[in-house]
Amino acid sequence: MKEQVEIRTLKEGRYIIIDDEPCIIKSIAHSKPGKHGAAKARIDAIGIFDNQKRSIVAPVTTKVYAPIVERKTGQVLSVGETSVQLMDLKDYTTIDVPITEDMKPKLEPGKEVAYLSSMGKVKMDIR
């Protein structure tokens, strides 16, 4: 799910969709309007799910999409080699979430963990 917003309303720490990938805004810089042009904004962001750096430059009146990112909690059912099986604590659905090697020692069956969900993708949120 996503909503449409103007670039002028965005701030650091909010989410934006760049190249069909939800990203978190790391920096935003506004330039002054020129003699014949509108004010521009440069947005630097990092992908939530792929950690790639992306940036866009556009007029501040441009409408862009902001994803709706949900932070949920789930219970670990089983830990595999490259993924973990979670059960959502609200609607009791079971999902497979990919994990990295450094996350494995922190996960064990029965433990409650937070995860992010947006645009059909899921990521563990271990801090």
UniProtKB/Swiss-Prot annotation:
Annotated GO biological process: positive regulation of translational elongation; positive regulation of translational termination
Residues modified to Hypusine: K35
Domain of life: Archaea
SMART domains reported in the protein's UniProt record: eIF-5a
Xref: InterPro entries: IF5A-like (IPR001884), IF5A-like_N (IPR048670), NA-bd_OB-fold (IPR012340), Rib_uL2_dom2 (IPR014722), Trans_elong_IF5A_hypusine_site (IPR019769), Transl_elong_IF5A_arc (IPR022847), Transl_elong_IF5A_C (IPR020189), Translation_prot_SH3-like_sf (IPR008991)
GO cellular component terms, semicolon-separated: cytoplasm
Location in the cell: Cytoplasm
One GO molecular-function entry: ribosome binding
UniProt keyword terms in alphabetical order: Cytoplasm, Hypusine, Initiation factor, Protein biosynthesis
Subcellular location, principal: cytoplasm
Purpose: Functions by promoting the formation of the first peptide bond.
HAMAP family: eIF_5A
Family statement: Belongs to the eIF-5A family.
NCBIfam families assigned: eIF_5A (TIGR00037), PRK03999.1 (NF003076)
Name of the featured protein: Translation initiation factor 5A
Biological source species: Methanothrix thermoacetophila (strain DSM 6194 / JCM 14653 / NBRC 101360 / PT) (Methanosaeta thermophila)
Organism ancestry: Archaea, Methanobacteriati, Methanobacteriota, Stenosarchaea group, Methanomicrobia
